[in-house]
Each structure stands twice: as C-alpha cells, then as structure tokens.
From Swiss-Prot:
Residue positions binding anthranilate 2: R165
Its job: Catalyzes the transfer of the phosphoribosyl group of 5-phosphorylribose-1-pyrophosphate (PRPP) to anthranilate to yield N-(5'-phosphoribosyl)-anthranilate (PRA).
Enzyme class of the recorded protein, top EC level: transferase
GO CC aspect terms: cytosol
Binding site for Mg(2+) 1: S91, E224
Pathway: Amino-acid biosynthesis; L-tryptophan biosynthesis; L-tryptophan from chorismate: step 2/5
Stated name of the protein: Anthranilate phosphoribosyltransferase
Assembly: Homodimer.
Gene that this polypeptide is encoded by: trpD
Free-text cofactor note: Binds 2 magnesium ions per monomer.
Record-level GO BP terms: L-tryptophan biosynthetic process
Positions of Mg(2+) 2 binding: D223, E224
Protein family membership: Belongs to the anthranilate phosphoribosyltransferase family.
EC identifiers of the protein: 2.4.2.18
Length: 335
C-alpha cells in the first residue's frame, strides 16, 4: 500500500498490477478510510488514466456475481451522474422506451447523489422492485427486454465506501467506474459523463473492456445527449474511436432550454416519465428523451442514422405502448 500511495503522491500512473492489487484490497475492506480517502484524492489530482479505470473495472467485475447469462449483446445507457443540474431522468426513461421497442436493455444504476432522483429512485417510485433476485431479473428481462441491476447489490465496495466518498465533496474514480461495472457486461453502451474532458478517456476504457459499440457523450455540461446545446461525442465503432459534435439539427429536432428539463423534486420526475410514456409529455421533455432513444437505436443497428431513430421513436410513442410496457415491468419485477 505504501508503494501505491507514494506513486500517486508523485503523480505517477499505477501499473495494471498495482491497480488490480489496490481494488482487490478495497473489495476485501483491507484499505483504511484514511488511506482510501488519500488514494481517491491523489488519483483525482493526478487524473485517472483509461488503463487505471479499465483495470479497476475489470477487477470489480471479477468479484461481482453475474445474475444470469442472456446470450445476447446487451445494451446499457448508465451514465456517471454528478452533473448537479437536477434534470428529469432522461437515460432511465429512454431505457424503458428502448426496451419497449425490442432493444435488450440491461440498466445498471443506483440512487441519486447529486440529483433529485437517480435511476433507482425513479424506478422504485414508479413501483418497480429494484432489488430483484436473479430469477426475477431473468424472468423480467426475458419477457420485457428490460432488467434493472441495482449497483449496491452487486458491488459492496461502492455501498461501503459511499459515506467516505460523500465527505470528500468531489467526484472520484468511482463515478467513472459506475457505468463500466454492469454485472451483465453489455456490449453496447451509451455513456454520459459529467465532464467533456472525460469523453475520450471513457471511450478508451470501454474499448479496453471489450465493448463492441459505444457512444460517450457530454451535452451542455450534462451526462446526456441534449438539444439545448452541443453534445460532444466519442463513438466506438469497428474498434476505432470517432470524435464529433451533435446538435438538435442532427436529430431533426428543435432546440429547447435547459431550464425546461430541470425539476424541483423526485415526484416531478415520476410524472414526467409517466407523461412521456403515455405520449402526453412536455415537448421539451419528450424530445430530449427521443434523441437519446434514437442514439440507442443507431448504436444497435436498428436505425441507419439518428434522424431515422427519431422517426421510429416518435411513431412508437404514438401507440402508448411504452406505458403498457412499464406496467408489465412493474408486475414482473414483483413476481
């Protein structure tokens, strides 16, 4: 441990072996709170490399139980969170709609830290059992193409280190790891990050982890694709990483103000979700979710481009099938 700390104090990247050793010790609670705080802060100041992030994620996955084997190329759109802008749950609503369109969504997430409502909070408030056992999860997924994996059930180190991390008052490597440690190991990911400087690092980490297709985004300071500002994107495709910017015109959608996406409490997020699924949501809410669903369809080769993905999603919403789909998820999650 002393060698690892000294390397970080001198702002040196850790070797793969050192990262694996460090996170194995963290998993087994062999690192004191003082040491863990020092390590997280030193990593933050140095700047986490994509290798450190990917090896840490691999180590955590090696110790996480896999609930079932689907045999499919699963999709996740879990983001880092941490943008502090308190918007509606764009990615969670997008995952519900995408799964109602037949995409195999394995949604990894947790409760809110910086927002009014995290993915777990929203789903729980909608009536979904967020702590499904493996049998329930597999059954729900097989019948709805949607499964929610509540991160603390699979990664105890996240749960146990949460109080310490909260006291640091800063984002750490754990924010980066959250979207990378889905126990079902999705091969397609739409990953939002809280800072655009992380886009390339996270794209490289996804590539190192063996993800086939991905888009890492930061839109107007949020960890989502947005319509109110430019969305910076790094796309992983055919083992290459492409960098580009997106705006509302790329989706053939009008721009909306960020303020229209912000909410005051968790109940507002629940109502926004229900309204969107029933095709009666505010245009500003619906269209930003549609842009994110379109991106999932594009990454999954279900739409040839983003504009086609938008058209497909808007037509699907008219049927109100996503609302019926949610009711099925709720029922099966408790079965």
């Amino acid at each position: 441990m002393k060698e690892i700390l000294n390397a970080l104090y001198h702002q040196k990247d850790l070797s793969d072996k050192e990262v694996k050793k460090l996170f194995t010790l963290i998993i087994h609670e062999k690192v004191s709170p003082v040491q863990l705080g020092a390590i997280l802060c030193a990593l933050k100041i140095k700047g986490e490399s994509f290798k450190e992030i990917s090896v840490a994620a691999t180590t955590l996955l090696e110790h996480a139980p896999k609930p079932f084997d689907s045999g499919l190329d699963l999709i996740d759109n879990c983001g880092t969170g941490g943008d502090g802008l308190k918007t509606i749950n764009i990615s969670t609503i997008a995952a519900l709609i995408a799964s109602s369109m037949g995409l195999s969504m394995a949604k990894h997430g947790s409760r809110s830290v910086s927002s009014h409502s995290g993915s777990a909070d929203l789903l729980e408030n909608l009536g979904v059992n967020i702590e499904m056992d493996p049998t329930q999860l597999e059954n729900c997924f097989k019948q709805t193409h949607f499964g929610f994996l509540f991160a603390p059930l699979y990664h105890q180190s996240f749960k146990k280190s949460a109080p310490l991390r909260k006291e640091l008052f800063t984002k750490t490597i754990f924010n980066c790891l959250g979207p990378l440690i889905n126990p079902l190991r999705p091969k397609i990911q739409l990953l939002g990050v809280y800072d655009k400087s992380l886009c390339k690092t996270m794209a490289l980490a996804l590539k190192a982890l063996g993800v086939k297709r991905a888009m890492v985004v930061n839109g107007g300071g949020t960890d989502e694709i947005v319509l109110h500002d430019i969305t910076h994107a790094y796309e992983l495709k055919n083992n290459e990483i492409l960098e580009y910017d997106l705006n509302a015109k790329d989706f053939d959608l009008p721009p909306y103000d960020l303020k229209e996406l912000q909410i005051e409490n968790a109940q507002e997020s629940v109502q926004a979700c229900l309204d969107i699924l029933e095709n009666k949501g505010k245009d500003s809410h619906t269209m930003v979710v549609v842009a994110n669903v379109a991106s999932l369809l594009y990454l999954s080769h279900k739409a040839k481009d983003l504009k086609e993905g938008v058209s497909m999603t808007l037509e699907h919403l008219k049927t109100k099938a996503p609302y019926v789909h949610l009711q099925k998820i709720i029922r099966l999650s408790h079965a």
